[in-house]
């Protein structure tokens, strides 16, 4: 097992080893800092492991620090990216007893109600849906337990109206 993965929560490290995953250079560089609770802006090429570089240490902290449900918010600019991130993270999350779910404009009312009753550990959403979450009392209460936020493709949001709206929400 790699040195950096061996520092992760035992369940997480074991799951990664079972899957045969090896850390990318980006992950080797970023994981120790984020595991220690430092904020980081991760800029690297597509396919370099940025998503897992940001998520693995947060899953580690979620497990080691017993974070409550709805402790990680993952914001992406596109619904299609939401679904991709949800698919990629769900398998790993389930292997260590965590839950991931997605919420955006296409999420059914029944699924939204389920998320409100039983929030996931990590919620993947869009900036617009994140803003709408402030309008409901139960949803605002859910947001109060958020300990970490990941904004994917921040460069696509930064120079637009969506970016400043997201900034206000955060």
Residue ranges and their predicted role:
Residues 1-14:
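Conserved ASCE P-loop NTPase core motifs with emphasis on AAA+ ATPases
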Residues 13-15, 19-170:
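Conserved P-loop/Walker A NTP-binding site and adjacent catalytic elements of P-loop NTPases
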């Amino acid at each position: 097992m790699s040195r950096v993965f061996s520092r992760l929560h035992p369940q997480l490290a074991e799951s990664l080893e079972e899957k045969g995953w090896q850390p990318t250079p980006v992950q080797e560089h970023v994981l120790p800092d984020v595991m220690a609770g430092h904020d980081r802006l991760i800029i690297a090429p597509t396919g370099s492991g940025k998503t897992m570089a940001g998520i693995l240490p947060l899953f580690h902290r979620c497990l080691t620090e017993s974070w409550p449900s709805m402790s990680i918010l993952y914001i992406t600019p596109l619904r299609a990216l939401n679904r991709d991130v949800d698919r990629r993270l769900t398998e790993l999350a389930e292997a260590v007893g965590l839950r991931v779910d997605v919420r955006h404009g296409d999420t059914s009312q029944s699924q939204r109600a389920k998320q409100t009753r039983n929030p996931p550990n990590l919620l993947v959403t869009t900036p617009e849906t994140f803003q709408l979450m402030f309008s409901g009392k139960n949803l605002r209460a859910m947001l109060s337990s958020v300990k970490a936020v990941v904004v994917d493709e921040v460069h696509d949001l930064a120079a637009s109206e969506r970016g400043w709206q997201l900034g206000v929400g955060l």
